[in-house]
Amino acid sequence: TYTKAEPGTHPTNRYNHRHEWRIGVSGDPKRPKIPVAGNNNTSAIQWGELRQVMAGTTSLVGSGSAKGLLRNLDTNVQEGLTEKPIDYDTFPLNDTGGERLTSGCGYPSIHKASALTAIDAYGPHISEGINDEARNEFLCTSSTLYGGQRLVEDKTAIIHAIGLTAQDAWLASARGASVIWSPRSNISLYGHTAQTPLLAKVGVSIALGTDWTASGSMNILRELQCAADLNEKQYGNFFTDRDLWQMATFNAALATATNDVLGQLQVGLVGDVSIFIGTADRKEHKAVVRAGVEDVALVLRGGIPMYGDAAVLEALGADDAGKCETLDVCSVPKRLCTERETGKKLADLETAAGKPIYQLFACGVPPKEPTCVPFRDNEFTGMSAADDPDGDGIKGAADNCPTVFNPIRPMDRGAQPDTDGDGFGDACDPCPLDSNHAMCRKPDLNDEDGDGINNAIDNCSTIANANQKDTDMDGQGDVCDACPTFANPAGAACEFSVKDLRDPARGLRPPLGTKVTIKNLLIVGLRSVKSFGFHARDVGTDLPYSGILVFQGGTKAPAATDGTPLQVGHIVTVTGNFTVFSEQDEVDTVTSVVITGMDAAAAALVTDVKTRDLTGGMQSAAERLENLLCRVKTVTARATLSATDDDFWVSDEAAEMCTGTTPGCTRVSDFLLDGDKNDGSPKYAAGTALTEIQGIVSGFANQYALSPMTLTDIKP
């Protein structure tokens, strides 16, 4: 879909995670959102496909499709093939809103592993970035820990896979997963790319793909050029030309589960063949790896000529009643069968695609081509020097891989990864998980994490823990136990108080997605109109960080598991998943609510605060007061949120006019009153004096508000 746009300009600071350039979540003006227009019509999609045909491509996987030209292997538009479409998944975590986690799997929703049984190939975008958030995506798609799903399997081709460790690569290899590598797009956006020498060493099959034109290559030949340049300058020629060629052919067919019909010159396959012209310095596989579009002599899709030297197509009689036209390509006459495939001549197709549009081909380096030279401002230049041959910014003896590019990523804790501690960096270590190179092991499905312990007896089979430490003796190793000091055998819920979950000073916060049980939880507010559930806190008077939202969802008023309607003052025991939604800590996926007592007087305990206290921010007063019953006194209504929103601003400071989200103001929300109906009630004119307002403190999207539960909570 995104092949019409010409490449954009990327900041020299580079990005750390895809959501930074997608929607600007970093908030850093030096890492802005990149605006990119998609292909908005069939002709634009066909124009992008034609660009790839001229490079020798016959099949692709990606967003959007159109009839003619290429086989779209993720759809049924396969130009004669009847393969099961690959499940192409741009957001396997359903994180389109930019959700990022450094631990736990409390994403909006993760693709179900059970869905893989109905398909032959799965292509999810995973770990597109270089920080902890990117690495966590792999953890949550390779294991069921903390609410994750086991999506990394032998039918999975991980797209990007930049933020992986050596142990992640080992696990992917043990499972038989492959990786789809897009070096130009990765380098231009992040300055880093997937650690392909490491992946290859542990046995991961690597396929090559261009990604989109906004940050990637114009066509597969330019992507091969990029891979070859990295191989020569950054990887010490780790890959052969044959290896690189195979990434664009057989390995790509393996990744899409089409190797039974595509990817090889073999009797019985469908005959997708591209022939290239070699030269004295471009022989054999290098004739493809270092080719330009002018060097493509013939492209056959199922034996049907699509593009090539004019003389060759004419000799084959591939004119199709004038539906193939001649085109000068870098001073070489070519023929291109555009009208036969799209119903339009080339000029008409370009017009129909609309402007602006990226050119069809280039002779040599395309204009505005995104860089393939690794670079991050003030970190590394990607340029070889006597004291830094691989250009990774680490000089001389300090570099644990002097000739293989392995700069330090934000996820690497300030050091080049060396998992086995033998002095050889993972990127260049022939045995990255074994310090004894004479006993170099290969990834084994029976030891997925590579710690030397068979899965069947490993107390943490997806995270390496050779010492098998299990403090609480519950059968789960400490490294994968959300509560290592509280026994929860067989994945039972961990018991926490709300303060355990939320107070940073306690240091007990578990990964998001952890199944938890909270006892002695006092209900202080009900969500009875919309987004049903309740606000509750730990029993007692130690209030900061003691409040939490229990989200029950559905369409019914809050109730216990036995159906008893819940009331303010009920003391309950709750079991569900600890997570974050729109910056608010909460318990969702609730499996049990049991009433254990009643204390209406304690539930009525209100905390008096100043309007300035309810200004947001990490570890602010407002965050400490989330989901507690609070009150502001002697305030003045200053302004409504907007003409169509009943929320209004109040302040207890005479000089504060609340012209925006200023520090001295509190937002009063009608969410608990009427579910944000915006029906004109409650409404207070600017200047109205109010004796007090009490309600529940909410922190939705880090925009704190006081939510009265009844109109009597607002006193004139």
Q: Which residue stretches match the model-derived regions?
A:
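His/Asp/Glu-enriched, well-ordered alpha-helical/loop segment
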Residues: 143-156, 192-278, 290-305
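Beta-propeller domains
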Residues: 118-137, 154-160, 164-171, 183, ...
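Extracellular calcium-associated, cysteine-rich motifs in secreted modular proteins
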Residues: 379-495
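Structural preference for beta-strand elements that scaffold enzyme active sites
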Residues: 59, 121-123, 155-157, 178-180, ...
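Loop/turn positions that initiate beta-strands
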Residues: 119, 268-271, 569, 688
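Metal-coordinating catalytic core of metallo-dependent amide/deamination hydrolases
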Residues: 41-47, 57-154
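Extended non-catalytic accessory segments flanking core domains
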Residues: 316-317, 321-381, 484, 488-716
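Active-site microenvironment of metallo-dependent hydrolases
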Residues: 1-91, 112-113, 246-387
